[in-house]
Amino acid sequence: MQSIVKKDLDLPTLRNESSNVKGLSHPVESIQLDQGKTEIKLKNFAMKNVFGTHMVMNNEIEKQIYSQFKRLPTLQSSMVGLETILGLDEDFDFGDYLCDPATSEAPLPQLHTSMEHRLGMTSSKSIL
């Protein structure tokens, strides 16, 4: 009976992908590591059945586009668009209030210096 239901619904096979990795102390640990992958698979499966395959492909393309946006080298990219698509903007973690660059003790690097270094315009020889 289960095989008939599975064939009719075309459910994705959900198996523990990290179970073969050595060094995990408990099976629950491997399940927790695979939770995000399994959740994405199920969400894509449901979206494919409701809206069609094009919707899953469209979301993957949007994720790729939003993950490419970068700021200048001295500023950290917040990736707001990517966080919104992935649903991470609804979570409130320690990093949201503990990793504020304005309260950091380390000074921000100079924009011109970091761009010259990135473009390879800095010379290792000193002028003096």
Swiss-Prot record:
<comment type="function">
    <text>May function as molecular chaperone essential for the assembly of standard proteasomes and immunoproteasomes. Degraded after completion of proteasome maturation.</text>
</comment>
<dbReference type="GO" id="GO:0005829">
    <property type="term" value="C:cytosol"/>
</dbReference>
<dbReference type="GO" id="GO:0005737">
    <property type="term" value="C:cytoplasm"/>
</dbReference>
<dbReference type="GO" id="GO:0005634">
    <property type="term" value="C:nucleus"/>
</dbReference>
<protein>
    <recommendedName>
        <fullName>Proteasome maturation protein homolog</fullName>
    </recommendedName>
</protein>
<keyword id="KW-0143">Chaperone</keyword>
<keyword id="KW-0539">Nucleus</keyword>
<dbReference type="InterPro" id="IPR008012">
    <property type="entry name" value="Ump1"/>
</dbReference>
<comment type="similarity">
    <text>Belongs to the POMP/UMP1 family.</text>
</comment>
<keyword id="KW-0963">Cytoplasm</keyword>
<dbReference type="GO" id="GO:0043248">
    <property type="term" value="P:proteasome assembly"/>
</dbReference>
<dbReference type="Pfam" id="PF05348">
    <property type="entry name" value="UMP1"/>
</dbReference>
<comment type="subunit">
    <text>Constituent of preproteasomes, but not of mature 20S proteasomes.</text>
</comment>
